[in-house]
């Protein structure tokens, strides 16, 4: 599922997955805790650009994994540059895991930093 802070057009980058946006689910405006509570029953992974989610929520309380796209500018072009590493992370992510894919200044030339938290 794509968080509200991720451009909805980004779902077109993941045609091999069933991806919904928060808005499509009718969950716009929910606080992160409420969103995670609802999402854990319908989705395996939440994709977000909210770098603070791991500090604001106790993610171990939810049955959902989280991937944070840590971009300098939160626009479609910048998050699209992370697609190869996002797809790799989706294949490797564990249950209840959080991964951070960090954009680098030369992210188009080298792999961005990808870390578990």
Identify the residue ranges that each predicted region occupies:
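N-terminal first-folded block
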Residues: 1-42
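A secondary-structure boundary/capping signal
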Residues: 2, 23, 49, 69-70
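Short glycine-/acidic-enriched loop or helix-start segments at secondary-structure transitions
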Residues: 11-12, 56-58, 78
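A short alpha/beta connector and helix-capping loop motif
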Residues: 19, 59-71
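Short histidine/acidic/glycine/proline-rich micro-motifs that form metal-
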Residues: 25-26, 53, 72-74
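Short, surface-exposed amphipathic charged segments that create phosphate/polyanion-binding patches used
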Residues: 35-37, 81-85, 115
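Acidic, metal-binding active-site segment of PIN/NYN-like and related structure-specific nucleases
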Residues: 39-59
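C-terminal structural segments of small proteins and small subunits
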Residues: 66-109
């Amino acid at each position: 599922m794509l968080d509200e802070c991720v451009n909805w057009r980004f779902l077109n980058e993941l045609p091999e997955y069933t991806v919904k946006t928060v808005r499509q689910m009718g969950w716009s405006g929910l606080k992160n805790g409420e969103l995670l509570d609802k999402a854990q029953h319908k989705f395996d992974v939440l994709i977000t650009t909210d770098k603070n989610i791991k500090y604001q929520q106790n993610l171990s309380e939810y049955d959902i994994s989280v991937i944070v796209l840590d971009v300098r500018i939160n626009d479609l072009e910048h998050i699209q540059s992370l697609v190869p590493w996002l797809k790799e992370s989706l294949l490797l992510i564990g249950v209840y895991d959080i991964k951070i894919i960090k954009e680098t200044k030369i992210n188009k030339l080298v792999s961005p930093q990808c870390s578990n938290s």
